[in-house]
Regions:
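Acidic/polar N-terminal loop/beta-strand segments that form early-domain functional surfaces
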Residues: 14-17, 37
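Right-handed parallel beta-helix
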Residues: 31, 36, 57-68, 85-98, ...
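Solvent-exposed adhesion/ligand-recognition segments of exported proteins
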Residues: 1, 12-15
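A cross-family glycoside hydrolase active-site/sugar-binding cleft signature
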Residues: 15, 105, 160-162, 201-202
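Beta-rich catalytic cores
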Residues: 47, 77, 100, 133, ...
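Extracellular beta-strand-rich solenoid/capping regions of secreted or surface-exposed proteins
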Residues: 2-8, 19-35, 42-63, 68-87, ...
Length: 213
């Protein structure tokens, strides 16, 4: 799998099912489709490291599970999956959990969709420098759609909308003149369940237009 995703212009299918024990972060290249639905039986589960989209545009990932856990390489950025400053990404029928930081964070992306996914069971005390954590994710972007997702069993950020935080004046770049231009999000038909004593679904600084249904 690592060899396949390290090169662009790939459609990846599976002849077998089971666990893939990652030895480092899995970086997905551009112009890639990972068709997890082609795996027989119980499908494909990635373990121990992050599924990362920070270097990829034009990507489709379907029916993949990512279980980060604290078994290896505990660090403050250990999400089950994440990516920002990318475009044209679809995550469909995936399941993400057991993160040290956030389960699934996607913001500052353009033309992004996460649909029919499970974002659950962020680890509470897994070695994060800030102590107890257990966060669902930071979401947002320009023309970003989050629909029919299940967010459950996290302490906080279920999710947190903060999606234009690095694409307006005052942060990394001046791609847009302000946060209102930088963010347009559609959030609908999602279920948020069993968040902890922190905030459930809420907004942070650097936000723009968010449609919640």
């Amino acid at each position: 799998l690592r060899d396949a995703v390290s090169q662009s212009n790939r459609i990846i299918v599976f002849d077998v099912s089971g666990y893939i024990d990652l030895k480092s972060q899995l970086n997905v290249s551009s112009n890639t489709t990972i068709a997890g639905q082609t795996a027989p039986g119980d499908g494909i589960t990635l373990r121990y490291y992050t599924l990362y989209f920070g270097k990829s545009d034009n990507v489709i990932v379907r029916f993949i599970r990512s279980r980060r856990s604290q078994v290896k390489d505990v660090n403050d950025g250990a999400d089950a999956t994440w990516g920002r400053n990318r475009k044209n990404i679809i995550l469909d029928h995936c399941s993400f959990s057991w993160s040290i930081d956030e389960v699934a964070s996607f913001y500052d992306n353009k033309d992004f969709t996460m649909q029919w996914c499970n974002i659950t069971e962020a680890l509470a005390n897994a070695g994060h420098d800030k102590g107890a954590h257990s966060y669902g994710g930071i979401w947002g972007g320009k023309n970003a759609s989050f629909h029919h997702n299940f967010i459950a069993h996290v302490q906080n950020r279920a999710p947190r909308f903060n999606g234009a935080r690095y694409n307006w004046s005052g942060y990394d770049t001046n791609l847009y003149q302000n946060s209102i231009q930088a963010e347009r999000v559609d959030f609908r038909n999602c279920v948020m369940y069993n968040w902890g004593s922190g905030n459930g679904c809420y907004g942070g600084p650097g936000g723009g237009y968010v449609n919640m249904v």
